[in-house]
């Protein structure tokens, strides 16, 4: 039995909305292009979270060309993807930073991406490590962002002016420090499909090796061939805040 058979069986039960979010554009460009080529060949959309502080001319040119061709959506991934917390879990926009401190980095990143990509950049924000604070949400709302994309296990934030579209399955997910097996990953995906909620799959191209690319390609083949797959950009799944 194929390791993806649980996913195929779950799709047989009914329609499923699914999106892919790839984080950390700015690191590992060649692997990024390889991932985007996989999606292009399957005619499936992908949202790319771009680190403003890691922009280069070649990254800008490559992403802009692919976004203009269709299927690739671009949005902001923090500012520099650095940890500012003195201890504990990693945050770029964490509890040790005030509204004003966070606003400086978010608006600087926003300006860099707008200068680089113009209207190809969507009003979506993914915080590094999927973590941020209520101050972050307030900054986003005050600076024109419409959507925050974290992880589905993240605690709700107070500011309802920004819609949340979380990822639900981490391709590199683990339990107690041990990476899921392919069959465990397939079961996680199948459970997400059966939930009736949109399925958001988080990828990290920079740590994706040839074997992982082959596995992602196999999943895309299953999704692309199944009539119940409703592949969509992240932004299309946002509810209107308020």
Segments from the language model and where they lie:
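Alpha-helical scaffold elements lining the catalytic groove of polysaccharide deacetylases
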Residues: 2, 84-115, 156-194
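Metal-dependent polysaccharide deacetylase catalytic core of the NodB/CE4 family, i.e.
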Residues: 45-138, 169
């Amino acid at each position: 039995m194929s390791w993806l058979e649980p996913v195929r069986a779950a799709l047989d039960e009914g329609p499923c909305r699914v999106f892919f979010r790839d984080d950390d554009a700015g690191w590992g460009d060649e692997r990024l292009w390889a991932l985007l080529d996989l999606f292009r060949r399957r005619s499936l959309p992908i949202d790319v979270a771009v680190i403003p502080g890691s922009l280069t001319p070649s990254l800008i040119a490559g992403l802009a060309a692919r976004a203009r061709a269709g299927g690739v959506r671009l949005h902001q991934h923090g500012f520099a993807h650095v940890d500012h917390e003195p201890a504990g879990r990693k945050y770029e926009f964490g509890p040790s930073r005030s509204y004003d401190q966070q606003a400086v980095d978010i608006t600087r990143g926003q300006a860099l991406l707008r200068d680089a990509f113009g209207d190809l950049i969507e009003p979506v924000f993914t915080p590094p490590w999927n973590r941020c604070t209520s101050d972050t949400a307030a900054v986003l709302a005050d600076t024109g962002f419409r959507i925050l994309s974290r992880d589905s296990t993240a605690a709700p934030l107070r500011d309802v002016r920004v819609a949340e579209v979380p990822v639900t399955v981490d391709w590199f997910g683990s339990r107690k420090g041990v990476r899921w097996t392919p069959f465990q990953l397939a079961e996680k995906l199948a459970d997400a499909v059966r939930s009736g909620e949109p399925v958001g799959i988080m990828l990290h191209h920079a740590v994706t090796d040839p074997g992982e690319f082959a596995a992602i390609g196999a999943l895309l083949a299953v999704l692309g061939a199944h009539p119940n797959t409703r592949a969509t950009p992240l932004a299309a799944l946002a509810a209107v805040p308020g």
